[in-house]
Each structure stands twice: as structure tokens, then as C-alpha cells.
Amino acid sequence: MDQEMTTVASPDIRVKATSPDSNRAVLEQSIVLSDSGRLDEGSSIRGGELERDSQEVGRETVREPLMCHDLDIHALAQRGDTAAIAAMLQENPSLNLSARDAQDVTPLHWAAINAHMGTCRLLIDSGADIDAIGGELKATPLQWAARNGHLYVVHLLISRGADPNIHDSQGFNTLHLITHSSAVMPLLYMLHQPVAIDEKDTDGHTALMWAAYQGDALSVDLLIRHGASVNSTDNAGMTPLHWAAVKGNKVSIMHLVEAGASLDAKEEAGKTPRDMAEELRGLVPFQKGLEEAGWSIDGVKMEGKLGPRNTILAIFLLPIAVLWLIFSTFKWLPVYVGVPFAIAEFMGMQYTVVLVLLGHIKAQDKVSTSNYFASIITASLIWVGYCWISRFAVNTPGYAFSNLGFIIMFVGCCWTFWTAIVTDPGFVPKGQQDAEIKEVLEDLVDAGRLNGTNFCIVCMARKPLRSKHCRTCNRCVARFDHHCPWIWNCVGAKNHRSFLLFVLFLIGGIILFIRLTIAYIQQNAPEYIPTPNPGLTTCDISTTLCQAGDFDPFLLCMALWSTLQLTWTSVLAISHLWQVSRQMTTFEVSNLGRYGFMGGRGGQSLRDQSGAMLKQAAAVGAGIGMSGAGEEAAGPPGAEAGPEGNALLPPPGGHVHGPQCRHGDHARGHSHGVLHICGALWKTLTGPLMTILGLDRFTKGKALGGMKRAGRDQNPFDMGMVKNCIDFWLPDNDVDYMTVYEIPPGGWRAYRRKLAMDKRVPGGKGRYEVVSEQEV
């Protein structure tokens, strides 16, 4: 049954009740006053909120001044005309700020639902009833703001004493309504307020049930990690897993099952979650969710036969044996027979790892998260070392310097490879205590900066500049570069140098290994004599390769295998050396190509993003004063980012790209011509190879475009090539990237000078401070 809130005055907000399936209040339509004071029924509304021009995001909308008598206080509050309300109060100090309009709604309700921070603050400071219950749903201003996910309005109201535990006529409290909004950051904030996480509405639904029904996997995960019950039941006996099965969201199902949700729970009609999924034709996502959680469709826990530790050991040993088998195959069989056998042996290794050793893991990235690729590098190093000891050490006279150089490169490669694997890449510490997390949240909300750019909802920690949440490691990494399966670790602030040294040592070692291989063959191999009958010739390639293959096929295969690694490692080394010289990471270069700025979605550059953050903080009223701005400063409701992403803010230039844009035919769609088909086919064939070799970061997206755009104006950390290289190769531990949260007003150079000064002066603080330009 639809319920409506109407008013004799023009503002009209309609609310209707829906799922599951009869009692969720959602915003249907809003008629707002235009800048001219007339009613606009065709205005673009999202979540009950007038879509403002992107230039207006983060500040009060500028409107033509109106006389107080032109509109009543309710219409002014809905407009967010703080100045007019202030003038009205000055003219009539006894004005009733809790007066009701025809819908039984107060001005604070209208200001809250439209996210007018300045108006809300003025009304509260002037004595408006903060917990006034109004409208047909008998809700408070806090509940109206929560329904639309207005984080900063919710924070303002709660900080001024609003009660989040009041229920409206449908039995919803503030936590239920924020869950309805699907906005993650407001939900996170509310979970650290004095609310009962398992409070039920009139029909017995908890916030977790609502999140599961909506398919909001982030909200489901957040509620579970804050202690929500996964086995509570509503009035119909349905659990959160039942509602997740109704929606068919596999990620929500996975989170619930991992948290211990019962697969055998039955609702009042005797149906389990699986029964409901099958009845609603959602068995496929339900099964995938179970598999990714480590369960079979029959409710049996899937576990590896060897156990985690033995599985790692088996994956480590398997490439050692298989590489020996592949290289020895060419010793036992002719080339034309050995090649198919070698391919079959390699594919057999792949099959064993993926389907046998890791067969119980259904995650798509299970191979890249395992030690498989690192084991291939380890096996290669073992057999290269074996070849040097058994062949080059005593059988290459006259190449002492090459042998010495190879030993240095080999030892350096092994050492840096090991350190890159075991070194903490710069994992940002996770939040542990609720009080500590709440303090960080309150600080960020007060500053108007609680969003995915600054806080990770998975790690429950504030995110430093240049950091990123790695989905593979499931941790935030300071000065994140990329996740490298070849070192079984992320590359970040603390192990980036070890990683690059490993690559450089590897390249140098391969070059010297190839040189020593050629010298060994030339000095020790007998003269190659082809078969006398041309029809029986077994080697039609160069005489040198035929001679090497006939003399020592194992060594030749090892040299060719090493040469293959030389290709991608050379590209990797060149790109990283270039990035080091520009004080950039692979992730930042990729962002430049995709978004036009380094730090992800949020501004044209890190410099611009920081400026935008300061403007946003001022706009949402973080400072002292009556003026404020709408919630739009933090992005529209529900636009909060996940753990590996940033808030979707409109670009500073004011233009928002969409279907209405006309930037040429290429901007409107894609081509299905021959070139497009060939390009797609090429990507399909080479994509997996590029991923395995680690070259995908240079080919996917617009990474190459990012390299072209990597100018100094877009990089506030660039101190010049020489200083950048010194900073990378000779670190003095001045900069702790795990605690740098913003660019100082004086710039990065000023910050570095201040750190150096503090280090030289006895008693210097030696830590991050905001530095003014006058101090340097």
C-alpha cells in the first residue's frame, strides 16, 4: 500500500512501500523549487536530491535573493536558503522553527532530506526540535537524512543529540534506513554509534537481512564484521541467507556462508536457502557463492587433500621436477618429437596445480594468489645454478670475469628475490579497537573526508596517500605499485627497491649465462656433422644451435628458457626505472591513462584532489560557522567506493560525461568492423600470456597513455630526476608513506626540507607536519 507525504505548498515528496515485499519506504518522486521560485516537476532527481551542476558540488547553491515573505520557512528549508531563514529569524526572533506544514513536517526535515548542512546547522542552533517526529511515516529528520545516505547531515544531527534508536511507523530505526540507502560510508559511521545492530523492524527484518535482500555485498560484509547475527530469523522464519538467495547475489551469499550462516535453516514453509534459490531460478549464483566460500552445493566443506602447508610445499617442488623433465625430454627425443612432449608436460603441470592441488579453491585468482609463479622462478634459478656448477665453473677457461659477474648476479638475484617475497611491502595496520576506529571516523567526518579515498572499509584503517587496497593480499599497501605473482607478494613502499634489484640482477645474470653458454659450447662441443642423407637431416637451423643441441640439449633448453624471461624482464626494468625517475608507481601511471590523474577517481591530479578535499571540508561545514554545503560534496548517495576504489566525484572542469555527450562518433559506441574483430581476437589470444609474463599492466586499459601524460604538473611528488632516483635508491627513512595522509600546503619539496631539517637539528620531530611556504 503506497503511503504519501503531500503538502499544500509546492514541495512534494512521495514515498511508497516495497519489498520484502510490503514495507520498505523508498523515494519515488520529488518536486522541488527551481532557482526562479517556481515548481519544476521535470527536475532530475536522484534519491530525493536535485542533481546539481558539478561546479556546485561541495558548496551552497547560489540562488537569486528572495524576500522572506515570498516563501514560508518550510520552502526555504527545502531550498536550503540559509540567508533567507536567518533574515526571517532576525526579523521575528520568536519564529517557531518546529512548526508543521500540511504534511506534519518541520523545516528541519526538509533541510535534512535535501542535505543542506548550513540550513540544518542554523535551525538546530536556533532551537529546532532535533527529534521532531513528522510526516505520515512518523519519522525524525535523522531518519529522513539516513534514508538518502546523507552522511554529513547524519553526523551533524547525531553530534547534536539526535536519537538513532527511534522507530518510525514501519518499525525502521536509523540503521535500517541507512542500510536501505545502500551507502556504505554512512552505514560504517552508524555502526560505530550506540545502535543495536540486530534490531528488528515490524516484520522482524534486521539490517543484515535488508542488505542481503538488496544484494549490497559491501554492506553485508560490513555488518557481519561488526557482529550482525547471520542466523537470526524474521517473522516468517527467514534468515539473511534466505534473503540473499532471493536476490541471487553470489558475493553476499559467500560472505554469509563464510561467516557461518546455516545452510539447513528452514523458514516457516520448510524451505532452505537452497530450496528458495532453486525455486526462484537462482541456483547458479547460489552455487557459485557457496563454492567461493569453500562449500559444495550439497553443503560439504571443500578442503585440499594435502592441507595448506603441504599444498604450498607440493607447488614449490612440482616446477623443479617438471622443468627438469621438460629440458631432459630434448636429450632423450628428437626435437620434432620432444616439442609436443614438452608442451604436454607443461600443460600437465598446469593441470596438476590448478585442478588438483588448488582444485578445492574456486576463486578466479587462486593461481595468482598461490606460490605457483614464484615456484617457477625458484625452479629456474635452481637449474641455472646447477648448469653453472656442473658445466661453466671448470670448463670455461678465459672467462673468469664473466663467471665472477655471474656469481655476483646469481647471488644478488636469489637474495633480492627472497627479500622481495618475505618483506612486508608496507601493509597499512588494520584498525583493531572500536574506540580507535571510531576516533578516526569522527576525525574524517569532521573534516568532510570520510570516503573511499581516505578510509578502507575492509582494513578499517585510514588510507595514506599513494596507497591502495590489494584485492589479492586483502590489505592496504603504502605507496602501492602492483601485485606481483612472481614474488608472491605486493610491491610497495618497503620492498619496491628489492623487487627492482631482483629484476636487474635477473637480467644481468641471464645475459652472462647466455654468454657463458656460448663460450662453453664453442670450447667443448665437438664439430657438428650433419647426416649424409639430406632427407634424414634432423637439424635445419643454424649450425651453432645444431651443435649445441647435439652436444648438450639440456643446457640449450635452459639457455632458451632464460632468454624467454629476458624479454618481459627487460620491459619491466625499463618501465620501472622510468617510473622511479618520475617518482611514480605502476598504479599511478595506470590511473593517469584511465582517469587523467594519479590517485584514482577524484580529481585531475593528486594536487588537484587535495585542493578538492580542502574545499569539500570547508563546504560541509567542517570549520566553525553557520554556512555549509550539501552532502553532494562527498558524492551522490550510494556512490561511496569499495576496498580497491575511490569516491566517484564529478571532474573539476564541471563536465560530466554521459550518453548526451557528442565528442565525435568514437565517443558514442564501438565498431564491429574487421579491425575491431581482429583486435578483440588478438587480445583474447595474447591476454593470458601477457598476464603470466606481467606485461598486462602495460597493455590493458590506457597505461601507455598514462606514460605520455606523466608530466610534472600532474605529479606533486616529482622532485626532479636526480633527486627522485636518490630518494629511491638511497632512502634515509625520512618519509613514512604509511602515515602521510595529505600533501603539505607548501608542496612535497617543502615537506622533504622540513624532514631533513628536523633530522639534523637535535630534538627535531622527524615526522610529518603541515609546512607553510614561509618556513622554507
Curated annotation (Swiss-Prot):
Cell compartment(s), UniProt: Early endosome membrane; Golgi apparatus membrane
Intervals, Lumenal compartment: 333-336, 390-402, 520-553
Keyword check for Membrane: yes
Domain DHHC: 454-504
Region ranges (Disordered): 38-58, 628-665
GO terms for MF: protein-cysteine S-palmitoyltransferase activity
Low complexity: bias regions: 629-645
InterPro entries: Ankyrin_rpt, Ankyrin_rpt-contain_sf, Palmitoyltrfase_DHHC
Membership in a protein family: Belongs to the DHHC palmitoyltransferase family. AKR/ZDHHC17 subfamily.
Annotated domain remarks: The DHHC domain is required for palmitoyltransferase activity.
Protein name: Palmitoyltransferase AKR1
Organism: Cryptococcus neoformans var. neoformans serotype D (strain JEC21 / ATCC MYA-565) (Filobasidiella neoformans)
